[in-house]
């Protein structure tokens, strides 16, 4: 009880909706919800319950991204933080499969309409067609060289 509990209670339905919207945009069709103590409940289409750890690394990455992007939205809604920059470090370098890369790229394209989105990756050559601009860093004689394409 108290002010913090009331704030959480007010924003929790919005958070759960946003998380599920982002998961859907990334073609991950589960029902995700957080309770007032931030315990998650994840249900499949057939309403079987799953724990976070039972998902593949790529599926966990989608869940993590949905939560991350939701927190950004909540901060904007609350007027406590509004930032037009999103920096994602090595998000494409780990566990997203080809479809996950495509789905995340679509979400980032939409976000880039109102935000400056920067993706740091070691797989630049595989992603050049996914972004409108790239900035490349290459180490030459112990100095970083920058080129833009």
Role assignments for model-derived ranges:
Residues 1-31, 47, 82:
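Charged, surface-exposed helical/loop "interaction arms" that form contiguous linear patches used
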Residues 11, 37, 108:
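Catalytic phosphate/metal-binding cores of nucleic-acid and nucleotide-processing enzymes, i.e., regions
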Residues 25, 32-33, 55, 76-81, ...:
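Conserved catalytic network of the ASCE P-loop NTPase/AAA+ motor domain
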Residues 29-60:
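ABC-fold ATPase nucleotide-binding domain signature/coupling loops
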Residues 57-87:
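GG-anchored amphipathic helix commonly corresponding to the ABC/SMC/Rad50 NBD signature/C-loop
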Residues 73, 90-93, 125:
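Catalytic acidic motif of RecA-like/P-loop NTPases
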Residues 78, 82-83, 91, 95-106:
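Conserved D-loop/post-Walker B switch-helix segment of ABC ATPase nucleotide-binding domains
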Residues 99-149:
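C-terminal lobe/lid and adjacent interdomain/linker elements of RecA-like ASCE P-loop ATPase modules
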């Amino acid at each position: 009880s108290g002010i913090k509990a009331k704030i959480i209670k007010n924003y929790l339905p919005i958070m759960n909706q946003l998380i599920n919207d982002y998961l859907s945009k990334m073609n991950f069709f589960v029902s995700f919800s957080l309770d007032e103590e931030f315990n998650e409940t994840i249900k499949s289409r057939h309403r079987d319950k799953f724990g976070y750890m039972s998902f593949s690394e790529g599926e966990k990455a989608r869940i993590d991204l949905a939560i991350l992007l939701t927190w950004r939205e909540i901060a904007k809604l609350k007027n406590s933080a509004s930032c037009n920059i999103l920096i994602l470090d090595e998000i494409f370098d780990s566990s997203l499969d080809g479809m996950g890369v495509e789905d995340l790229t679509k979400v980032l394209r939409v976000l880039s309409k109102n935000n400056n989105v920067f993706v740091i990756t070691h797989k630049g050559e595989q992603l050049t067609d996914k972004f409108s601009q790239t900035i490349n860093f290459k180490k030459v004689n112990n100095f970083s060289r920058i080129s833009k394409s």
